[in-house]
Amino acid sequence: MLHVLRQLSAGEESIVSDPQVASITPELDQAAHRRLAVELFNFVWTLIEKADRTAAEIDQMIHAAHASCHHWGHAGTNANLGRGEWQIARVYAVLGRAEPARWHAARCLAYVETAIGAGEADDWDLAAAYEGLARAEAVAGAAAESARWRAMATDALGAIADPADREIIEGDLAAIPR
């Protein structure tokens, strides 16, 4: 197996002759990508909410969050990609990993801003993006930056029409360590 990895990494032709077996992933239609994105997103939430994750579950949570976002890239809007990046940032924040949490929270905001410009965003996307940045900064120990993003998220709550949506983000904001 190591020989195969070396051969492939050197750019040599694959020793697998069947193109179906040799392909990394089969072609999926948009519906399949969307279904996988949603299912993986929901699976990640079960692991985020689990108090006593094993090392294997932590790995699953990280990989599934990235995979969900990957599939949104094939079948979603900028808003979907922003939500995927938000979830990845949340995963890393839960794990106390500030650098990737910051990276993905910033990517979330960029996608959400693009989605707003394209008319694709829901009224809660901006507040959620700001919440993700506030959480990432809190994990990094940057209290002033976290407070700045938290204030922006709080201001953005006023744009959310559905009280249930607003309450979810208010709860997320309240749970951010100070």
Question: Predicted segments — roles?
Answer:
Residues D18, A55-A67, A98-R107:
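Helix-turn-helix repeat elements of alpha-solenoid scaffolds
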Residues E27-A31, H71-G76, E113-D122:
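Flexible helix-coil transition and linker loops at the boundaries of alpha-helical arrays
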Residues R35, E57-Q60, N80, P100, ...:
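Structural signature of alpha-solenoid helical repeat junctions
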Residues N42, Q87, D125, G132, ...:
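"A position-specific structural signal for the A-helix of alpha-solenoid helical repeats
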Residues H66-H70, R107-G117, A151-D162:
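Amphipathic alpha-helical segments of tetratricopeptide repeats
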